[in-house]
Each structure stands twice: as C-alpha cells, then as structure tokens.
C-alpha cells in the first residue's frame, strides 16, 4: 500500500513538473520591438529593431520547428491569426529573416506591433505577438 502511494505521489510530482516546464518553454518564446520604445518621439525616418527569444529567425519558406520571420504592423489591428498575414503598407513582411528596418512615417501618433509568421506567413499555433507600442513622429 505504501509503495503504491509512493508511486502515485511520484507520478503526480512528475506531472506537475512537466506541466510547469512546458509552460515555461512556451512563456520564454516572444517577439519584442527593441527600438523605438513605447512613448518615444522619433524623426520622420527612423530605424525599428526587432527582438526574438526562444525561436530562430528564418527566411519565408523555411518549415523547420521553432522558426519564423517578423511582420511589422503599423497603425492596424492584428490580422486573422488563422490566415497568412496580409502584405500591405500596414503589414510589412520581413521574409529574409531581417531583424530591423528603416521606416518613414508622417508626423503624428502611430502604433507598431510585431507578429511572427511561419514559412507560409501564417502566425504560429501559439502566436508570438509583441506588445503594441505608440510613438510620436516629429514634424
């Protein structure tokens, strides 16, 4: 009886540890806009630097696990997460695996947000989406 209880307790501890480890692995994956910072004032032409953790940047058309490429959303909402990310002036694709770009925007307030796409430009099953930042472009 004691041996059976010990096995059950061991299995429960192992299960809890596995769930915590899996949750940590998922939470350690993220994309972030490194520069500019939220609330920053920038010139009309400025650089945007992208960060990624827990995944590897790869060109579009790469279908290996834990890889993807950045898409920058400018002044727009998130796209449908089940479809390829649109390509337009509001949804910029960085299909060569780039980690930065230079933008020119009109003066005023703007929002920027990153989303990682897979080899087909579709967000991952656990989408990696940055916080939306707001910047002000100087005249």
Can you say where each PLM-predicted feature lies in the sequence?
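A glycine-anchored, Pro-Gly-centered beta-turn/N-cap motif
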Residues: 44, 106-108
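Short acidic/polar inter-strand loop motif in beta-rich domains
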Residues: 79, 117-125
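Short beta-strand elements
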Residues: 126-139
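Short coil-to-beta strand junction motifs in C2/discoidin
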Residues: 62-70, 129
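N-terminal signal peptide c-region/cleavage motif recognized by signal peptidases
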Residues: 18-20
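Short amphipathic, basic-aromatic surface patches that mediate peripheral association
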Residues: 51-62
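Short, compositionally biased P/S/T/A/G/V-rich stretches that sit at domain boundaries
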Residues: 24-43
């Amino acid at each position: 009886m004691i041996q059976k209880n010990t096995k059950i307790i061991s299995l429960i501890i192992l299960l809890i540890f596995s769930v915590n480890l899996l949750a940590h692995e998922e939470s350690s994956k993220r994309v972030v806009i490194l520069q500019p910072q939220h609330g920053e004032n920038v010139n009309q032409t400025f650089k945007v630097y992208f960060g990624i953790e827990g995944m590897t940047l790869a060109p579009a058309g790469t279908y290996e696990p834990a890889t993807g490429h950045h898409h920058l959303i400018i002044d727009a909402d998130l796209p449908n997460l089940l479809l390829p990310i649109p390509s337009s002036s509001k949804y910029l694709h960085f299909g060569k695996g780039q980690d930065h770009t230079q933008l020119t925007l009109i003066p005023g307030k703007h929002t920027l947000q990153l989303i990682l796409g897979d080899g087909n430009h579709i967000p991952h099953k656990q989408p990696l989406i940055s916080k939306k930042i707001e910047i002000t472009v100087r005249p």
